[in-house]
Design a protein with these regions (language model features):
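N-terminal Rossmann-fold NAD(P) dinucleotide-binding loop
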Residues: 33
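Aromatic pocket-lining residues of Rossmann-like dinucleotide-binding sites
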Residues: 40
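Conserved N-terminal/central alpha/beta ligand/cofactor-binding core
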Residues: 45-46, 51-138, 176, 184-186, ...
């Protein structure tokens, strides 16, 4: 009898583990995933956040500390709350400077976890969507999703906040990858670029050696005709955090499968640039360093040959998990080898090499991943094709939207897409554009979050949202992801309240609640000041003591 009771209890427990029901199921622990889950939970929804690996915050806690803010005055809502909390962590309110736009990764992740805990969100890590068969639908509604460990999650509303858009894709939502042609939507920034002046080789480097062998890291495929569409993806890299504080510094690691031939083009580039400039390249000309607190810097790509691994990510968006893991490892090996080469190869100018050796990985960041970032910078992967597709004009001329849920302002920014052999036989990069002057603060429409009605009616997509490559190049910044996630969480509550498809959410109610929570729909310092007033009411000022962390200058009130 006792055995029978225990057997029944075991079956009940196993069943409970195998199937869980929630109002809101959020897939992907990116910063957008956190804000989506927090917003929904604060609205009273029973919410779960599923993260495929074991960190939350995505790039914001994974190395992208040098936040791409554009015009700071457009950032509001839960995104602003995150940077406000970071400011409180660093004590910046004591110096009439409340927002920390560049928090250290470990600080960012701690804040995100705190927000999730306070809101009562169930966070389940190492819950990756089962490949190919992870989504069950009935008609246009997702009924449940299944993770690799066999757990099934039923929900009323689902939100895909992953960088890859796997939940979206398995739900049979229309999407695209790569670049549209200039003709498709009338976009001057679309398609293959005729000229790529930025992050280019300033000197001519033959693409082939004397015996005709193509240099490593150069593609032999043709560039393509300017303005035509292709399936190529802008380059990925890791946003590495480095320090020049000796007590906290670990020397640049040498990858196990280091191959010096991989950097032959870099060696030639460095050698040719010295006579061209009349001096060796500086560390800031092969890496973009952005100072963050406590003696650290966020390192990004800069120049013709840098940390971007150009042309090696084309199979990532639609790749299976094993393909993506291979590409991820390849990027890590390449970038570690790039830093090792600069710090150790005898062909590197001594001045540049000495600068590189002043820096290394910090002991106090990414301690469970060898002090290397836990997140690859997936700048772009799948992009949903919804009933409304944001295009270049939505950044430049068609700025006002009746269904606005957030604002963007960052310049149109695409990294290089390919490295090829030009008509004269020299190495050339293609695909980068940096367009800021003609991009004005603009509304982001709720419609970019919603799939086509005939496909899915209970899914929202705040990261792989509906936009062209040109529009996505501006809208893809982490503060915007966070604000779109905030809107998705509230929209989920409204859809559940009204028993309505996500396409029919009451926009007036959505905007009213967002504004009450500090969202910004107009550009100007006074509107962010109103949002900050809301935050100050929620958070008591901490004790005023101690100096500011290194990297934040003293800022005192004007007298």
């Amino acid at each position: 009898m006792i055995r029978k009771i225990w057997f029944v209890f075991f079956l009940a427990a196993a069943s409970s583990f195998a199937q869980q029901s929630y109002d809101l199921v959020v897939y992907g622990g990116s910063a957008a995933g956190v804000t989506t889950a927090v917003a929904g939970a604060r609205q009273g929804l029973k919410t779960v956040l599923l993260e495929p690996r074991d960190h939350v915050g995505g790039l914001v806690s994974g190395g992208l500390s040098g936040t791409d803010v554009g015009k700071r005055e457009v950032i509001g809502g839960l995104a602003l709350e995150f940077y406000f909390r970071a400011g409180r962590h660093y004590g910046l309110n004591r110096h009439h400077q409340e927002l920390a736009w560049m928090p250290e990764p470990k600080v960012a992740e701690a804040i995100f976890r705190e927000m999730l805990k306070e809101a009562g969100v169930t966070l389940l890590e190492r819950h990756r969507l089962r490949e190919k068969t992870g989504v069950r639908k009935e008609g246009t509604r997702i009924i449940e999703i299944t993770t690799e460990n066999g757990t099934r999650f039923q929900g009323k509303i689902f939100v895909d906040t992953s960088y890859e858009g796997d939940l979206m894709a398995q739900s049979k939502v229309s999407y695209t990858t790569g670049r549209e042609s200039t003709a498709q939507y009338g976009e001057s920034l679309a398609g293959v670029r005729a000229l790529t002046p930025s992050h280019q080789f300033a000197v001519e480097i033959p693409a082939r050696t004397a015996d005709g062998t193509l240099l490593p890291e150069v593609s032999g495929a043709p560039r393509g005709e300017p303005g035509t569409a292709d399936q190529r993806i802008q380059a990925y890299n890791f946003r590495v955090i480095a320090t020049n504080v000796a007590a906290n510094r670990i020397p640049w690691p040498k990858p196990d499968n280091y191959d010096v031939k991989r950097y032959e083009l870099l060696a030639i580039y460095l050698t040719k640039m010295t006579p061209y400039l009349g001096r060796p390249l500086d560390i800031n000309e092969v890496n973009l360093l952005r100072v963050i607190p406590n003696g650290k810097a966020d390192w990004n790509n800069r120049g013709g040959f840098s940390s971007d691994y150009i042309g090696k990510n084309y199979d990532y968006p639609d790749g299976d998990y094993s393909t993506r893991a291979r590409i991820w490892r390849d990027h890590e090996d390449y970038q570690k080898g790039f830093y090792w080469f600069l710090a150790n190869d005898p062909r590197v100018p001594t001045e540049l090499q000495a600068q590189m050796r002043e820096w290394g990985l910090p002991k106090d960041e990414f301690v469970d991943t060898g002090h290397w970032p836990h997140q690859l910078y997936i700048r772009e992967a799948r992009r949903m094709v919804g009933p409304f597709v944001a295009t270049q004009k939505d950044l430049q001329t068609d700025l006002v939207k009746p269904d606005a849920i957030a604002m963007g302002s960052y310049g149109a920014d695409s990294h290089n897409v390919q490295r090829f052999v030009n008509d004269r036989g020299f190495v050339e990069n293609e695909g980068d554009f940096q367009v800021s002057a003609s991009v004005n603060p603009y509304h982001i429409a709720y419609r970019v979050l919603t799939p086509q009605r005939e496909e899915v009616t209970n899914l929202l997509v705040p990261v792989c949202f509906s936009a062209t490559h040109a529009a996505y190049s501006s809208m893809r910044m982490e503060p915007q992801y966070m604000m779109l996630g905030h809107a998705a969480g509230i929209a989920a509550q409204l859809a559940i309240r009204d028993h309505a498809p996500v396409q029919d959410v009451q926009i007036v109610d959505l905007q009213r609640q967002l504004k009450a929570e500090g969202a910004i729909f107009q550009y100007g310092p006074e509107f962010q000041a109103q949002a900050l007033t809301i935050l100050r009411r929620r958070f008591a000022a901490p004790p005023r003591q101690g100096p500011l962390p290194w990297g934040y200058p003293e800022k005192r009130a004007a007298k």
